[in-house]
Amino acid sequence: MGDKMDMSLDDIIKLNRSQRPAGRGRGGGRGARGGSARGGAGGRIGGGRGGGGGGAAGGGGPMRSRPVLTRGGRNRPAPYSRPKQLPDKWQHDLFDSGFGTGAGMETGGKLLVSNLDFGVSDADIQELFAEFGTLKKAAVHYDRSGRSLGTADVHFERKADALKAMKQYNGVPLDGRPMNIQLVTSQIEAQRRPIQSQSRGGGITRPRGGAIGFSGANRRGGRGGNRGRGRGAGRNPKQQLSAEELDAQLDAYNARMDTS
């Protein structure tokens, strides 16, 4: 030690290099440390491969031991579960069977009645067509303000009853208007076009009270005519002046203008 204290730093470095063993390098030292220090943890996780590997490597550097992952004794839940038994045949849930035979489609016979009087109600239609068979629906079409459109739907449970009612009542007047009855043959709802009202003047209607009288247009026209005739008869007709009388009036007017 006393010799090294008197030596310079460069001489000490040269001496240390000359005394170092030839077979030992930096890698070997690290390998030994890696085998001893990291061998314990590697043995607990991966089966004790870290210590032996570090010593055998020598100058090759440390070798990291990787844990071996096993699934022993750990049951993981499946991401999804399949049904035990799948149906042999796929079937749409909106249809019962067959193509185009939906459960929501209507059956039976449906009539479209048009050219109805605006006073015909749902009860009148039901009472009129109920004698031919069981009705599913019988209703008059109304607009948003509650006025009748002059058309109605009559839906029978059986198509034969609808045909019988159409043959019996097609063209028959109801409250003075002949009913126009058509059989709706497609599932598409028939286009509802309100028929223009016929002229009420000059016709005789049958009120539901049983009395027969003129329509409102005739009554209004009659009152207007009476008032017109009364006012015309009370006035005196204008007297027509002759040419001589007109000349005399003109001369009198001119004379008054001259004097003024």
From Swiss-Prot:
Primary location: nucleus
Annotated region (Disordered), positions in chain: 1-89, 189-260
Gene Ontology BP terms: mRNA processing; mRNA transport; RNA export from nucleus; RNA splicing
Recorded GO MF terms: C5-methylcytidine-containing RNA reader activity; RNA binding
The organism's place on the tree of life at top rank: Eukaryota
Bias kind Polar residues: ranges: 189-199
Annotated CDD domains: RRM_THOC4 (cd12680)
Family that this chain belongs to: Belongs to the ALYREF family.
Stated name of the protein: THO complex subunit 4
Gene that encodes it: alyref
